[in-house]
Design a protein with these regions (language model features):
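Non-catalytic alpha-helical coupling and interface elements of nucleotide-dependent molecular machines
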Residues: 40-44, 92, 248
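Short coil/turn segments at secondary-structure boundaries
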Residues: 50-54, 100-101, 253-254
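Glycine-rich, acidic loop regions that bind phosphate or pyrophosphate groups
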Residues: 1-54
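Active-site diphosphate/adenylate-binding microenvironment
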Residues: 59-134, 139-140, 145
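A diffuse structural propensity rather than consistent per-protein peaks
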Residues: 46-48, 79, 215, 232
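Thiamine diphosphate
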Residues: 3, 19-20, 26-28, 32-38, ...
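Domain-wide signal for the mature, well-folded portions of proteins, strongly enriched
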Residues: 48-54, 88, 112, 210
């Protein structure tokens, strides 16, 4: 599209500063109101019929790609996409996915294709580490009859996890999936990709003398939740089914 000389991009944002994008016509305002105004301004104009057909074909191709990349796998260490895919396949349309920060955000955002409104919450603007569990608790309080699933890396989990206890004692059940990759892996990757050296992001390469492995399932149990460690995508799917049946907060950890 950017190669098309007639291509026009419209950028809508409530902030005048953020509405300014390269090669875009800036519109400052609420997205819903602005779209209605733009639609009214267009009158009877509509995109060619083959444009809709093209968009559906592209969407189907994208969904097929996602299903393939996030599908069942026997590889020793599953990817974030595999983890998100396993939970998505076993979830119900009303289940709400919550994530923030790290590599999980990008993968969950792509794999979790909402089947109902308001079933995907991502804190991405500030990559707010540890929003996952506390945010999930707030969402559960607002949606007590729905399953709320928090996807969280071990780094964010270690920074803030006490709302597991809060969820238990207030009877606001959460399902928490902990992806244990041994530290702040995305920041470590950024350091390396920018030409730097590892610096205290992955635990095993940090300057420590007494490194200990953490049993996140046992830690969750100490806060009153049910905890379970799994080692494969198929085990994760089975654990998630058990978590769905549980009456209280359930934490599943996978490396």
């Amino acid at each position: 599209n950017f190669e098309n000389p007639n291509f026009k991009l419209v950028s809508i944002n409530v902030s005048r500063f953020d509405a300014n994008k390269h090669m875009a016509e800036s519109v400052v305002g609420d997205a819903k109101v602005s779209l209605l105004d733009i639609s009214n301004a267009l009158g009877n104009w509509k995109a060619p019929d083959d444009w809709y057909k093209k968009s559906r074909e592209a969407l189907n191709s994208w969904n097929n790609y996602l299903d393939k990349e996030s599908g069942p796998t026997n590889q020793k260490l599953p990817s974030y996409a595999h983890v998100a895919g396993a939970i998505y396949r076993k979830s119900d349309p009303s289940d709400i996915a919550v994530t923030a920060a790290g590599g999980l955000v990008g993968e969950v955002l792509q794999v979790w294709r909402p089947r109902e409104l308001n079933t995907h919450e991502t804190e991405w603007g500030f990559s707010c580490m540890s929003y996952e569990i506390s945010g999930a608790l707030g969402i559960k309080m607002a949606n007590p009859k729905k399953e709320v699933i928090a996807f969280v890396g071990d780094g964010s989990y270690l920074l803030y996890n006490s709302d597991i206890y809060s969820s238990v004692i207030t009877n606001h059940k959460l399902i928490i999936v902990v992806c244990d990759n041994g530290g702040h892996a995305v920041i470590n990757r950024l350091q390396l990709y920018k030409g730097g050296k590892e610096f205290n992001c992955l635990f095993e390469s940090s300057k420590v003398d007494n490194l200990k492995n953490i049993d996140f399932a046992k830690h969750a149990e100490s806060l009153g939740a049910t905890g379970e460690n799994v080692s494969s995508v198929s085990d994760l799917e089975a654990a998630f089914v058990r978590a769905k049946k549980s009456k209280s907060t359930y934490v599943i950890s996978i490396k």
